Amino acid sequence: MSFLIDTNVISEPRRPQPDANVLSWFRRTDQAGIFISVLTLGELTRGAAKAARRDAAAGRRFQKWVDEIQTGFAERVLGIDLKIASLWGELSVARTVPVVDSLLAATALVHGMTLVTRNVRDVADTGVAILNPWES
């Protein structure tokens, strides 16, 4: 089974008090089956840049972590192609869904993956298989 993880999932273990269910999900899941999107890397990079504006050292630490994520997932980073963009366009007609969340749903659908996210409500109507590790 393959999973596409949202930014909130990849970020959870880094929190001062990460959710035990999320940590357990990561331990139980074959890492080779976990993928991230270029969108997630973009959101993480944005987070590092925002952190650097407040505290340069914290921003560098955050960016170092983002670089480690990018290296660790090197072969498991999914881009946005024409098929994903077209499906996203179709999914966006039914109702307004946050762009990144709906692009992640389209990516997971095209690749036959389960989307792992806490934002279940945002993608519930897309038809994507969803797993919320906070509730597993």
Regions found by a protein language model. Name each.
Residues 1, 105, 109-136:
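Acidic, PIN/NYN-like endoribonuclease modules and their adjacent C-terminal/linker elements
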Residues 1, 25-28, 68-69, 77, ...:
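Short secondary-structure boundary/capping segments
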Residues 1-36, 50-66, 136:
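Short, well-structured N-terminal submotif of metal-dependent ribonuclease cores
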Residues 10, 41-44, 85, 123:
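A generic structural signal for short hydrophobic patches within well-formed alpha-helices
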Residues 12-13, 25, 47, 87-91, ...:
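Residues that scaffold the ATP/ADP-binding catalytic core of kinase and kinase-like folds
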Residues 34, 75, 128:
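Short, conserved active-site loop motifs that form the nucleotide-linked donor/cofactor pocket
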Residues 38-39, 81, 119, 134:
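Residues at the C-termini of beta-strands that transition into short coil/loop
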Residues 46-49, 60, 71-118:
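Active-site neighborhoods of divalent-metal-dependent phosphate/nucleic-acid chemistry enzymes
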